[in-house]
């Protein structure tokens, strides 16, 4: 199960494209509404979360995903985010974040000494991460980071490959006519 954490102000592309890749691969997902049951994107679109933070049971967690955008500030100081990150660190689940959201992982020490990418606007918030400036997506151990909206499809395909293998990711690539 991939738990997708939604906050008001998330970047639309950074949430939709990776989830589309996961869906095409048949990977189950649950949307967790961090800032409420109804979440509003940067562009004003609303989605309904599947569960609230109080309903979250991580026992079947394979990966957590934090979409970025201007709403990234809404991840900080949220007990559900702290709990999910701690669970992933303890159980070695994957953690994926894109754009500004890798700064949330950095603030929790997850990226200390790890290679990572992020949106340039949060470079100074990346702590002891080893920033990879020429990459769209970076994988280091159980952490997957994407640099921004332009990396959304590639991040989603990388998530599929890590969870279900190269063949599953290639099938999705072919299905969307991806040439990257």
Where are the regions a protein language model picked out?
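Beta-strand-turn-beta hairpins that frame and shape the catalytic cleft
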Residues: 138-143
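Conserved hydrolase catalytic core segment
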Residues: 110-111
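Extended, subdomain-level signal for the structured scaffold at the beginning of enzyme domains
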Residues: 1-91, 95, 104-107, 125, ...
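Short, thiol/selenol-centered motifs that function as redox-active sites or metal-ligating centers
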Residues: 98-99
């Amino acid at each position: 199960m991939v738990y997708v954490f939604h906050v008001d102000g998330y970047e639309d592309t950074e949430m939709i494209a990776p989830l589309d890749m996961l869906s095409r691969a048949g990977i189950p997902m649950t949307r967790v509404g961090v800032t409420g049951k109804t979440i509003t994107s940067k562009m004003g679109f609303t989605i309904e979360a599947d569960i609230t933070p109080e309903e979250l049971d991580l026992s079947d967690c394979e990966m957590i995903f934090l979409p970025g955008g201007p709403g990234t500030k809404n991840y900080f100081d949220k007990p559900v985010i702290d709990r999910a990150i701690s669970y992933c660190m303890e159980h070695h689940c994957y953690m994926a974040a894109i754009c500004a959201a890798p700064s949330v992982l950095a603030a929790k020490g997850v990226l200390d000494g790890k290679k990572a990418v992020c949106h340039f606007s949060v470079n100074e918030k990346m702590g002891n991460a080893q920033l990879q400036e020429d990459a769209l997506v970076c994988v280091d151990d159980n952490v997957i980071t994407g640099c921004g909206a332009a990396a959304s499809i590639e991040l989603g395909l990388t998530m599929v490959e890590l969870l279900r293998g190269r063949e599953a990711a290639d099938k999705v690539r072919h299905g969307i006519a991806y040439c990257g």
